[in-house]
Amino acid sequence: GLGDVYKRQPYIPFKDDIVDWHEAARDAMNCFNKNFYKKFSENCNKYFYLPHRSERRGVGGIFFDNLSSLCLEDSLNMLNSVADTYLKSYLDIVLRRKTTKYSPTEKEFQLIRRGRYAEFNLIYDRGTAFGLQSNGRIESILASLPSEVRWTYKKSNEYKSMEKKLLQVVNRDWNV
């Protein structure tokens, strides 16, 4: 079956970016089936979840695999639509935020939060597990991991405050 993912994992979230992201995903899915966005958004929230942290990995989007309800042509058109929408939405956010300055504390926060990405990929991701179990090329399988990641035992009060704000955003249902 067919599968794809369209998601974001911001470290410093902006509400308008998240809403625009989800609206674009919804609009892309509605061209093919009005029920796809809700279903695939829920799939995304369930799949990209870290049970050992009790948190989602990002602000969601859409996720589907083994999709077989569309004919081949419509499936390919939907994949193209998802890819085009992803690129446009992401570029819109980059252009909107490209001049945003981040403090050293925010950069440190980003490095620590990237650890969640690594944790998910190494513990829960089916694609990573499949690649490792099938004796695939390890470097290729792990190439998607961030080159810089940090874990800390004792977190500053500023970090705890940033994490609390982020988790309120991440664990919210953003379906539009």
Q: What is each PLM-predicted segment?
A:
Residues 125-144:
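Amphipathic alpha-helical/coiled-coil segments positioned at domain termini
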Residues 73-129, 165-176:
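Extended, compositionally biased non-globular segments
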Residues 138-176:
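TerminUS-proximal long segments
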Residues 14, 33, 132, 146-149:
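Alpha-helix initiation/capping motif
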Residues 62, 117-120, 138-145:
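Long, contiguous hydrophobic alpha-helical segments, chiefly transmembrane helices and signal peptides
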Residues 72, 131-134, 159:
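Intrinsic-disorder-associated interaction segments
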Residues 1-6:
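Short, small-residue-biased leader/transition segments that mark boundaries at the very start
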Residues 7-100:
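Long, contiguous internal "core" modules enriched in hydrophobic/ aromatic residues
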